[in-house]
């Protein structure tokens, strides 16, 4: 498992929205894509 994060497609805020991304510290692994244009502060918010 990983730490969930808010993708741009999930909505504007974490409140009441599903967090469909996972934070990866070293960039998105193969087969995943960055799903958040700005942030998170540490790592990348990636989605399969």
From Swiss-Prot:
One Gene Ontology biological process: regulation of signal transduction
Gene Ontology CC annotations of this record: extracellular region; nematocyst
Annotated organism of origin: Anthopleura fuscoviridis (Sea anemone)
Family affiliation: Belongs to the sea anemone sodium channel inhibitory toxin family. Type I subfamily.
Protein name: Delta-actitoxin-Afv1b
Keyword Metal-binding: no
Superkingdom assignment: Eukaryota
Keywords: Cardiotoxin, Disulfide bond, Ion channel impairing toxin, Nematocyst, Neurotoxin, Secreted, Toxin, Voltage-gated sodium channel impairing toxin
Annotated compartments: Secreted; Nematocyst
Disulfide cysteine pairs (residue numbers): 5-45, 7-35, 28-46
Gene Ontology molecular functions: sodium channel regulator activity; toxin activity
Protein function: Binds specifically to voltage-gated sodium channels (Nav), thereby delaying their inactivation. This toxin has a great efficacy for Nav1.4/SCN4A (EC(50)=30.62 nM) and Nav1.5/SCN5A (EC(50)=62.5 nM). It is less potent on Nav1.6/SCN8A (EC(50)=about 300 nM), Nav1.1/SCN1A (EC(50)=390.55 nM), Nav1.3/SCN3A (EC(50)=459.36 nM) and Nav1.2/SCN2A (EC(50)=1998.00 nM) (when measured as the increase in the slow component).
